[in-house]
Amino acid sequence: MSTRKPHRLACRLKSVVASTVLLLAGAVAAPTTAHAAPANHYYIQIGGTGAAAEAPGCTTSFEAANRQLNGGIAIPVCYVASGGPFVGSHNEQPAPFAPSFGDSVNQGYWNAKAALENAYRADPTATFTIAGYSQGAWVGDLLLQTIANNGTEVPRDRVDGMLYSDPMQPGTGFWRLVPQGVLVPFVAYSPGTGPEVFPGVPVQRHCIKTDGVCDATSLNSFPGFLQQHPRYFREGEIIASTLARHGGSGTVWYPAA
């Protein structure tokens, strides 16, 4: 009987086995594909009047929120956060030599812009949220307008905004009552109202009904300011529960408590 066919079959089996071994060895030896780490996300945080703190904390307005950033990185902005000639969270304490709102906002704007651009230079793949509360929202509104107009080093598609109790809120904010450029003595020149939309930059405003800073629309706005305005930054309240959900647009309204 001929043994040629079994011999050929054995050779083929050896060839298949050898090829399989080589393929498996190659798969083991091949380096795994590297996965790029996700880009960092930074929160440029601009606090409200009377909330200034020593560096590096700079402001107390975002302390509760910073415990819930889900891996985000807080960059608090140091500035005087003053409202001379009165200071305090409700501007209830006379302070004739304290910087005015206008001077304080000007300092906050330039410090916030520098903080944003410095962070971008150090981490050019990062994304950013401009977060401002009260006077800090005024600062943030101005800075976001600059970003939307391509006036910073940071591409505007890397940035969004979260503004809490923005006095420049269009249609309802305090500054809609004073024409742009008009001086309110000892306070500031009116910045007027902010835009409804910041081109290329998603910005979401948050306002409690009757808070006279962002809802200056009725006689209830002054007592409402005293009652509602401190709610934003409290543990479990609006800033802490929403800041990490940045990226939206428009205005979110909350009922007065």
Predicted segments, located by residue:
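Surface cap/lid and interfacial helix-loop subdomains adjacent to catalytic sites
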Residues: 37-118, 146-257
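Alpha/beta-hydrolase fold nucleophile elbow
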Residues: 121-133
